[in-house]
Amino acid sequence: MPASKKYAAVTGAGSGIGQAAAVALAKAGFTVALIGRRAEPLLETKETIGRADGEALVVQADVANAASVEQAFAKIADAFGRLDVLFNNAGRNAGAVPLEDYEVDFWNDVVATNLTGVFLCARSAYRLMKAQTPQGGRIINNGSISAHSPRPHTIAYSATKHAVTGITRSIALDGRAFNIACSQIDIGNAATSLTERMNRGVMQADGSMAPEARMDVTHVANAVVHMADLPLEANILNMTIMATAMPFVGRG
């Protein structure tokens, strides 16, 4: 295996931020494992990477299912032999629901994807990075602006993103002995299909509705590549990237 070969895995790689990051990582020289539940969008991402002469592997998995995640990372280990970077990106929106109207099943569903899924994928990547030679690697967790300042009526989403920060810092501490770095990128208003509603208006801190500025998702993808390509002696523990005009600073 050439010493210069680099391997990455991206969860939620079939659309949005995950797709953009996977394509950018491939352009930066990484061979990329594309992880997601549905094969068709993953194959579309692989085709995009292939058109730019990149290499990718499609890995179908449900990040909220422990057995599925373990099988996915076993497939990655078998195909690549090692893993240098995990972009732990998969997550779901939860809309705006007043606390008194929250159903326990809805809460559990958000937690399963946004928190348990992050834990399961980080655990599998950590095991792989600890066992491989040379030892080490980097885990980049997708946090959110909501890891610092919540939007109204988003208690489940905000709670899971705050918890991701705890996962990031714990792995950054525990991984030191094994040359495993852990980072978090907190993203605000990247232009994807999930944020199209921002053009029409989203709830503000005072309860009013207003449109919000968005930024091109390629800026996020390029930021992920920058974090991923650092030597393991350096780590960006936290990065916040946001649309310049979005109401974040002071919104709480």
Please identify what each model-predicted range represents.
Residues 14-16:
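Conserved glycine-rich cofactor-binding loop
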Residues 30-44:
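Conserved glycine-rich Rossmann-like NAD(P)H-binding loop of the short-chain dehydrogenase/reductase
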Residues 40, 60-72, 104:
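The beta1-alpha1 cofactor-binding region of Rossmann-like NAD(H)/NADP(H)-dependent oxidoreductases
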Residues 97-99, 106-108:
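Substrate-binding pocket helix/loop in short-chain dehydrogenase/reductase
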Residues 122, 160:
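Active-site helix of classical SDR
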Residues 144:
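Residue(s) in the substrate-gating loop at a strand-loop-helix junction
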Residues 184-185, 203-249:
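C-terminal helical subdomain
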